[in-house]
Amino acid sequence: MLCPEHTRTERLASKVLGYCGSCLSEKKDLISEALLTHRKLRSTNGLVGLVARDGKVVCDGCGNHCRLSEGEIGFCGLRHASGSSIIENFPGQAIVSWYYDPIPTNCTSDWICAVTRKRELHTPRERQNNLAVFYGSCNSDCLYCQNVSHKELTVAGRPLMTPEELANVVDAKTACVCYFGGDPGCNAEHSLSTSAHIHEKWKIPICYETNGNFSRKYLERIAEVVLQSHGTLKFDLKAFNSNLYLALTGVSNKTVLSNFRHLAKIGRAREHEFLVASILLVPGYIGISETKRICRFIAECDVTIPTVLLGFYPHNYMLDLPRTSRNHAHECRKVAEAEGLVNVRIGNIGLLSQEEYNVE
C-alpha cells in the first residue's frame, strides 16, 4: 500500500503499521498505535506484549532492562520477578537449537571473515562447517523478522541445552561458530559460557549476529571473546531514528547505539576486523534518508568499520512490501560512501529486485 500521508510521492507502507518510515520518524503520536500493534500481535502468539516499565525489580539480562512487578515475565520470556530478585526460567540452560552450515555460508561479514578469506588464520582444509547456534528467544520484535520461528520456541520453552552440551557439538570439521536467533543479546551468559567450554578444546573463531541490545555488563566480555578468537561481531543497525526503531521493533535503540559506540572504541586498536555494521534496506522504511542517518552515526564512530547493506525479503507481518530493489541498494551505497565510510558492500545481491518505488 501507499502511505496515506504521501500518496503524491508514492511512498510505500506496510498495512501492519499503516504509515511510511518518514511519518513514523516525525510523528510521535503514531508510535503509541504502533506499540499497540506489537502488543496485540505478540499476545496473540502467547508472548509478553511490551517491555515492562512500571515494576520495581529491574532485570539486567539484556539492554531492555525490563522493570518487572511480582511474578511478571520479561519481554524475552526467559526471566521473571520474584520478591526483589530476577529468576531465570531455565537455570543453567537456554532455549537453543543448532545445525552445521557448510562454508561458504551466507554470513553477512564473509568479505572480511578470517575463515572465508584464510588470511589471518590457517584453517585446516578438513574444517568445512560453521556451527550455527539459533537461540529461541529475542529481546526485539521486528515486524519483518526473517527468523520468526524463534517465537514458537520461546512459547514451547524447548529445546533446552546447557553450555556444556552445546559446546560438545563442536567437532574437528567445525571452522567457526556463530550465535544468532532470535538473538544472543538476551542469552549472553549462556553464549559466553559455551564459548569458554569451546575454547578449552578448539581454537576457532566465535561470531555473534545480533541486534546489539546487550546489557552493558556483558559487552566487554563478548568483545574479548570475539577479538581473541578472530571472530566478528555483526551488529544489525535497524534504524537510527528512535521513533522509527520503536515502531519497527517494539523496543528502544538507546542501548543499541550506546553499545555500538563502545564497541567501536574497543575496535580502534584491532589487528583484524572485529565489528561489522549491517543495514537491512526495508522498502518504505529504511531508504536513502534513514540510511544516511545510520551511516553518519557509524562514520562518527569509525569510518573504517565494515558496513554491509542487505536486501529485504518480505516476511512475517510485512509480506506486502516488495524485495529491495537494485536501485535502492545502489543509491544507499552512494549515501554510505558520501558519509565517509570506506568499506561498504551490498550483500545478498541475489535477493535484489527490479521493482520501482520511492527509495527516499
What are these regions (language model features)?
Residues L78-Q228:
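Conserved Radical SAM active-site core
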Residues G74, L131, L275:
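A broad, low-specificity signal marking well-ordered, structured residues that form hydrophobic/aromatic
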Residues P159-L321:
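Conserved AdoMet/S-adenosylmethionine-binding subsite of the radical SAM
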Residues M1-V48, R53-D54, C59-N64, E70, ...:
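Auxiliary Fe-S-binding modules of radical SAM enzymes
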Residues V16, E33-L36, E72-F75, R79, ...:
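A generic "cationic amphipathic patch" detector
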